[in-house]
Amino acid sequence: MKTVVALLLACALSLPVLAEEEKKEGAAPQVIYHNLVPALVGNYGVGPRLKFYKADVALRVTGVDAEAKVIHHEPLIRNQLVMLFSQQTEESLASPDAKELLRQEALKQVQQVLSDEEGRPLVEDLLFNNLILQG
């Protein structure tokens, strides 16, 4: 009888451990927002007056491996974004719709860079945490 009770107790104590292992195996990959730090700062537009921008950018990736690859290629990503921002005109940044188009174009370019380097885009979305324009 004592043996049966001990066996049942041992089985009961091991169930939470088995449930935890199943949860880890079936868990969805973690979504990570990787902030490009420091913020992107530069000038844009043409004309006699310099116009400046400051953009705090976050990249959404799924999984730690994807984030590690994005971090590895961050200098290339930053360069691509700086070049994109420097090509903008005052008109292309004047409205919220224009800023959304810029965000979408930035996402496309980041995905293209990562596709060229890693064989797949890795970044699912690009977000402007803050976009400041001074003209």
Write out the residue ranges for each language-model feature.
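Flexible, low-complexity charged segments
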Residues: 1-135
